[in-house]
Amino acid sequence: MSSNPSSVEKKLLHYTGKAIADFNMIQRGDRVMVCLSGGKDSFTLLTILNQLRIKSGNKFEIFAFTLDQAQPGWNDACLRQWLAEKSIPHEILTRDTYSIVKEKIPEGKTYCSLCSRLRRGIIYRYAEENGFNKIALGHHRDDLVRTLMMSILYNGDIRSMPPKLLSDNKKHIVIRPLCYVQEKDIITFASEQAFPIIPCNLCGSQENLMRKKVASLIDQLAIENPKVPSNMLHALQSLKPSQLMDQNFWNFKNLEDGLETTQSIQCEEVFNAQEFELEDEKI
């Protein structure tokens, strides 16, 4: 921890530490691979985790992993210097996923899905080959609430980015220690620390992405009610299945069984769902 931490640094340490404790993200002896993309979020994550590691008495390890995807203009010289100055173990691995993405995705379409899929595969493989049991990602509170809104509006389901999950190959735990942290605090901290940010030219060149639209919508709502983002985050921790419509989580069809009555009720269906099916139509 800095000898004289700023107010925003104290805030980041508090909320990151709280998230780690709330979800039991890191345990004694863990080898945590921090995915350092070169953006403000991952720089903040690595810096704060390193301070918490020191505070814990080195009860866990951290390692910075950066994937150079061979994008034009990529320059990691400042990143290498920064990592060396911080004495943080690291590796910058070069894999040309850029050419694959450019070849497969038509001009004007978003590259994010394929790009992240390729990146995820490389990250999992590297973690497995090098004995890291935890993979830390830099998604923050606003990423979580934007993803929730996107899922509802564009996919028709309720999901977001979990704070902790088991990887698809069942070999790693993926954690998001910044899940309580506001993006504005990360921006302030990144400015204070003068991180050597490496911009993502691949994504930044594309306008009108869904995520930007949703972020703008949430920002507009927050002007009238500043609690909107935090309320959305709280909603992810306060599901009420009986107030929703998912029959996998609530037995709506047989609620009559729970009635407190002396009368005998016959729970025989008058209609069945098949009678009202329409082909290829969604309500």
Curated annotation (Swiss-Prot):
Homodimer. [4Fe-4S] cluster binds at residues 112, 115, 203. Catalyzes the ATP-dependent 2-thiolation of cytidine in position 32 of tRNA, to form 2-thiocytidine (s(2)C32). The sulfur atoms are provided by the cysteine/cysteine desulfurase (IscS) system. Pfam families: ATP_bind_3. CDD domains: TtcA-like. Its main location: cytoplasm. It is found in: Cytoplasm. GO terms for cellular component: cytoplasm. The keyword Ribonucleoprotein does not apply. A motif (PP-loop motif) lies at residues 37-42. It catalyses: cytidine(32) in tRNA + S-sulfanyl-L-cysteinyl-[cysteine desulfurase] + AH2 + ATP = 2-thiocytidine(32) in tRNA + L-cysteinyl-[cysteine desulfurase] + A + AMP + diphosphate + H(+). Binds 1 [4Fe-4S] cluster per subunit. The cluster is chelated by three Cys residues, the fourth Fe has a free coordination site that may bind a sulfur atom transferred from the persulfide of IscS. GO terms for molecular function: 4 iron, 4 sulfur cluster binding; ATP binding; magnesium ion binding; sulfurtransferase activity; tRNA binding. Its cofactor is Mg(2+); [4Fe-4S] cluster. SUPFAM superfamilies: Adenine nucleotide alpha hydrolases-like. This is tRNA-cytidine(32) 2-sulfurtransferase. GO terms for biological process: tRNA thio-modification. Pathway: tRNA modification. Belongs to the TtcA family. Keywords: 4Fe-4S, ATP-binding, Cytoplasm, Iron, Iron-sulfur, Magnesium, Metal-binding, Nucleotide-binding, RNA-binding, Transferase, tRNA processing, tRNA-binding. The thiolation reaction likely consists of two steps: a first activation step by ATP to form an adenylated intermediate of the target base of tRNA, and a second nucleophilic substitution step of the sulfur (S) atom supplied by the hydrosulfide attached to the Fe-S cluster. Its EC number is 2.8.1.-.
